[in-house]
Amino acid sequence: MMLQPPKVLLLYAHPESQDSVANRVLLQPVQQLEHVTVHDLYAHYPDFFIDIHHEQQLLRDHQVIVFQHPLYTYSCPALLKEWLDRVLARGFANGVGGHALTGKHWRSVITTGEQEGTYRIGGYNRYPMEDILRPFELTAAMCHMHWINPMIIYWARRQKPETLASHAQAYVQWLQSPLTRGL
């Protein structure tokens, strides 16, 4: 008997999605996976008025939460930051009584506009990517979630189509068995 993969909520946040070839290439094959719910935050909330209860229910209904977004000013796009601050509320995801996400898994899937070598001590961006992404890892820990090492596509807009296709294939393979691959 084959086990069903865990339900995955893919929270996609890109304010200029139509211009992101890399993110389109990553998302296209993922949408065929039945156990993956792709939730485009900018499409759902163009006015930034987030339905907190709906979002919290989505989180309750899934075991793996993927945050796919570009790296903006060493963080995430504004709507995702708003989402994190509002949806992962004290009493729901953290603090007294806030255990709704305990034991779930968090993975960040990030595209960048810079080469990998620029993310190092003394490099253009001054710090390694693991330091830049530390606030997301800390947020996962605050919510009692398991942190899965991020998938990062460096210099995304300059990647060759075959390289992006390879990243998309690796992404789909991981999503088919997210708790046994890429930990």
From Swiss-Prot:
One of its GO terms (cellular component) is plasma membrane. NCBIfam families: PRK04930.1 (NF003430). It comes from Yersinia pestis. One of its GO terms (biological process) is potassium ion transport. Gene3D superfamilies: 3.40.50.360. Interacts with KefB. Its EC number is 1.6.5.2. Belongs to the NAD(P)H dehydrogenase (quinone) family. KefG subfamily. The gene is kefG. Keywords: Cell inner membrane, Cell membrane, Membrane, NAD, Oxidoreductase. This is Glutathione-regulated potassium-efflux system ancillary protein KefG.
